[in-house]
Amino acid sequence: MIQMQTNLDVADNSGARRVMCIKVLGGAKRRYAGVGDKIVVSVKEAIPRGRVKKGDVLQAIVVRTSQGIKRKDGSVIRFDKNAAVIVNKQSEPIGTRIFGPVPRELRAKNHMKIISLAPEVL
């Protein structure tokens, strides 16, 4: 569950390391974002010579949450940290690689490019 002011790790090679959620997209009074939801983020920490720099305001897709995801069979998938992938306006990843596992629920939200780049789909 991601809300405003939540800090997230970046799970791609766009150049950002840490971002902070400044808005949850998808409704006027929407408060929380889960896996597969689009958020607006501000870059808080970036590497030198990356595609993005500190202070940039971008869109991102949440790929991992520490709260977890409940599945139909009753199982719950939790991750150690919250993570997101930086995307452009067409929801395509800016980076060319994705680090760490991503959940299968991204497929239902039509983020196929993220799933194809991920090393492991849980």
Swiss-Prot record:
The superkingdom listed in its UniProt entry is Bacteria
Q: Which Gene3D superfamilies match?
A: Ribosomal protein L14 (2.40.150.20)
Q: Name one GO cellular component term.
A: cytosolic large ribosomal subunit
Q: Which UniProt keywords apply?
A: Ribonucleoprotein, Ribosomal protein, RNA-binding, rRNA-binding
A single GO BP:
translation
Q: Which GO terms describe its molecular function?
A: large ribosomal subunit rRNA binding; structural constituent of ribosome
Q: Which InterPro entries match?
A: Ribosomal_uL14 (IPR000218), Ribosomal_uL14_bac-type (IPR005745), Ribosomal_uL14_CS (IPR019972), Ribosomal_uL14_sf (IPR036853)
Keyword match Flavoprotein: no
List the CDD domains: Ribosomal_uL14
Fill in the subunit field for this protein: Part of the 50S ribosomal subunit. Forms a cluster with proteins L3 and L19. In the 70S ribosome, L14 and L19 interact and together make contacts with the 16S rRNA in bridges B5 and B8.
* Family affiliation: Belongs to the universal ribosomal protein uL14 family.
Q: What does this protein do?
A: Binds to 23S rRNA. Forms part of two intersubunit bridges in the 70S ribosome.
Q: Which HAMAP family match?
A: Ribosomal_uL14 (MF_01367)
**Can you say what this protein is called?**
Large ribosomal subunit protein uL14
Organism equals Phenylobacterium zucineum (strain HLK1)
Which gene does this sequence derive from? rplN
